[in-house]
Amino acid sequence: MSIKIIDYNGVDPYAKTAGVTKTEVAEAYFQKTVMKCTGTTTQETALYSDALMSYASPQMGESVSIYKADCYSKDNPIYVVKGINANGNEFEEIVDARKINPKNCSFNELMVLNVETGHTSPKDYLRAAALRANADADSYFEKADYILHAQEVMGDYKVLGNWDSYLAMDKWLQSLLDYVMKSGFRK
């Protein structure tokens, strides 16, 4: 029995296009399906195109957008994280990227580190999402040890012989850890 990827309309996403690589289809599919998946539950979620990064989980009813604060500078990496929480309430919080401990942070804080280190591609988001799934976090606000979960996911990649993903995850993780060390945060 074979397993196929089926989109929300019951169509194999690879069957919808011709003359493109699977990578191009996968990235286009990601942008069309994940980044625009608003309003699929009774609770409304919102993604904003003016944000540095915006993501949502209709299943949890949460949506988050990340912006640089007005006082942002390289020496003062302050971000505004705002959106809608699982209770349907709007929230806004100020996050200093220098004070984020990836061994005990929320997914939102991990994404601020992603933005601060220039990791804003769909692949970077999916790396972080894989860690969140490994952490079994029920909310973007739930804290977890994302370093531990990165090591676990990398261990899985190693066992499976998925060296491209292993090396990409390692490079991404090292970039985050280098930033954390340079910012002076120690734990």
Predicted feature descriptions by range:
Residues 1-187:
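Type III/flagellar secretion export determinants
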